[in-house]
């Protein structure tokens, strides 16, 4: 069966969410997440359902329950709630957490915006990883640079991922200055709201 991205290309349909829209929105998400990390906090449950777009197109990170716990908890003892597909493998294995854990979730969220489906869960990937097949198909619709960013972020080995959000920020910035914000008014389905149905 053809992937959604390939079917869209064959039909001459635009990507599910434009690359420019993804870059603009997630550049701002990364700005916010970098600020969170500056305060020695981790989000730990980043996914499209926890990114809210205001009417002016500005994304807001929601659900900081797990992040608040890190103020008073040893990360090695912290077992936050997480969503399969968006959670890094170290969350499942209860290993050391860090900014690289949220980086995995960023990659998973961008992947969801590209394909309309969440990635394989980290547990499934360790048994039989199909993600590379999906990523190669997405290169037919999106730039190689953006797909490389997602691939890098979704590395199962935490040491092979970017260790901070800063490295991703340099790759995600739109190649041209935005001429207008991505707003719910201009795009009724909005950039991320349609994907909340996927993860609920």
Language-model regions, residue ranges each:
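Conserved HRD-motif arginine in the catalytic loop of eukaryotic-like protein kinases
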Residues: 161
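Conserved end of the kinase activation segment
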Residues: 90-100
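Conserved activation segment of eukaryotic-like protein kinases, specifically the C-terminal portion
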Residues: 76-90
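Protein kinase catalytic-loop region centered on the HRD/HxD motif
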Residues: 29-41
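Activation segment signature within eukaryotic-like protein kinase domains
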Residues: 25-26
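Conserved C-terminal C-lobe helix
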Residues: 141-156
């Amino acid at each position: 069966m053809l992937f959604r991205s390939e079917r869209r290309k064959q039909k001459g349909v635009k990507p599910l969410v434009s690359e420019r829209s993804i870059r603009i929105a997630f550049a701002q998400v990364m700005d916010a997440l970098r600020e969170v990390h500056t305060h020695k906090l981790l989000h730990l449950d980043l996914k499209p359902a926890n990114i809210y777009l205001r009417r002016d197109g500005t994304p807001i990170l929601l659900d900081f329950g797990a992040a608040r716990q890190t103020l008073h908890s040893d990360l090695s003892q912290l077992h936050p709630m997480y969503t399969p597909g968006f959670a890094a493998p170290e969350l499942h294995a209860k290993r050391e957490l860090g900014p690289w854990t949220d980086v995995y979730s960023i990659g998973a969220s961008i992947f969801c915006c590209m394909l309309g489906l969440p990635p394989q869960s980290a547990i499934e990937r360790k048994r039989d990883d199909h993600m590379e097949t999906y990523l190669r198909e997405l290169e037919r619709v999106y730039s190689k640079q953006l797909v490389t960013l997602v691939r890098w972020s979704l590395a199962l080995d935490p040491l092979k991922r970017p260790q901070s959000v800063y490295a991703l920020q340099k790759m995600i910035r739109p190649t041209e200055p935005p001429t207008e914000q991505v707003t719910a008014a201009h795009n009724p389905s909005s950039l991320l709201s349609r994907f909340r149905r996927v993860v609920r």
